[in-house]
């Protein structure tokens, strides 16, 4: 019994470490799929129909938002997130040349492909190595 309990505790500890060590995770909230980055709150938001891509950062008030950003709050479960978001739509033509992806391109270089994979690749490059 002690041996089984010891292995169970060891497995739970390892599972917890693996859970906390993940670089980013996806969370479904309403009709959007969010990818949270644990160190600085930036996210990629894709609407399945409208190809909307947002770049967001943590904020406490609308006054912290730049001219081309919108202040918004998002509820996930019992938590509320307050953010400044750049919310121009990508035109969804496959080459990522809508305003949303131009904004990401200007920040990080490279080209999007119109469906959010550019931002996913950026996350992979930055956090998975």
From Swiss-Prot:
Keywords, sorted A to Z: Disulfide bond, Extracellular matrix, Repeat, Secreted, Signal
Start-end of each Sequence repeat: 91-92, 93-94, 95-96, 97-98, 99-100
Signal peptide: 1-23
Subcellular location: Secreted, Extracellular space, Extracellular matrix
Main location: secreted
UniProt entry tagged with the keyword Transport: no
Any one GO cellular component localisation term in the record: extracellular region
Positions of the UniProt region annotated as 5 X 2 AA tandem repeats of N-G: 91-100
Tissue: Component of conchiolin, the organic matrix of nacre. Expressed at extremely high levels in the dorsal region of the mantle, which region may be responsible for the nacreous layer formation, but only in trace amounts at the mantle edge, which region may be responsible for the prismatic layer formation.
Disulfide bonds: none
Its biological purpose: May be specifically involved in the formation of the nacreous layer.
Subunit structure, as described in the record: Heterooligomer; disulfide-linked. Pif97, Pif80, N16 and other proteins form a complex.
Similarity section: Belongs to the N16 matrix protein family.
Protein name: N16.2 matrix protein
Organism for this UniProt entry: Pinctada fucata (Akoya pearl oyster)
